[in-house]
């Protein structure tokens, strides 16, 4: 929250949001209790903790709350959800965290897909970030949640590996094949504005 209220230019963006009718929630419980209206949720003073720092399922709960609130709008909605935790764990070379963050992200994606299944005029797009550190699964057992991974990039940097784009729902056919990541913007724009 400090990035919104303790700024060099002396603006307090939290107060500006309140002035525009937003409810400012400061915990996942507060976020979940909001039933209508405009919401700005800030669950950490600084950077969000990762899943190994007891963040728990607050990311999944936040996505659920956003979909529930935005779905009340008459003209539909556009929701962009970002998750930097898998990338951060890859840079750190932390196999356990990569796995746990991926499972957490999968739960959030599952909720979005469940929503799209019920609301036929919905498109869900899932885009990977830049691949980091060249993680390779050498062996393991998914049932036991036990894997052995190796990192192929010293220094834990981004690789040149292509990243996946998955789409489900109305217009998903526009997101097939290989494309530049900058093309995603134009394809989404064309769908939103029937171009």
What is each residue range found by the language model?
Residues 1-195:
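A post-motif C-terminal structural segment
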């Amino acid at each position: 929250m400090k990035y919104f209220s303790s700024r060099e230019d002396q603006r307090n963006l939290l107060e500006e949001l309140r002035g525009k009718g937003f409810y400012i929630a400061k915990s996942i419980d507060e976020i979940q209790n909001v039933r209508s209206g405009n919401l700005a949720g800030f669950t950490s003073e600084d950077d969000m903790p990762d899943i190994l720092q007891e963040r728990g399922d607050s990311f999944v709960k936040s996505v659920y709350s956003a979909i529930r609130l935005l779905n009340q709008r008459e003209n539909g909605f556009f929701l962009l959800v970002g998750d930097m935790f898998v990338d951060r764990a890859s840079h750190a070379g932390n196999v356990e965290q990569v796995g746990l963050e991926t499972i957490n992200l999968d739960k959030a994606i599952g909720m979005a897909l469940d929503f799209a299944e019920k609301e036929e005029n919905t498109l869900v797009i899932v885009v990977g970030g830049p691949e980091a550190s060249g993680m390779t699964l050498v062996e393991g057992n998914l049932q036991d949640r036990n894997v052995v991974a190796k990192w192929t990039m010293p220094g834990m940097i981004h690789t040149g590996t292509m990243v996946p784009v998955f789409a489900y729902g109305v217009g998903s056919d526009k997101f097939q094949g290989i494309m530049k990541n900058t093309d995603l913007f134009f394809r989404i724009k064309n769908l939103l504005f029937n171009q």
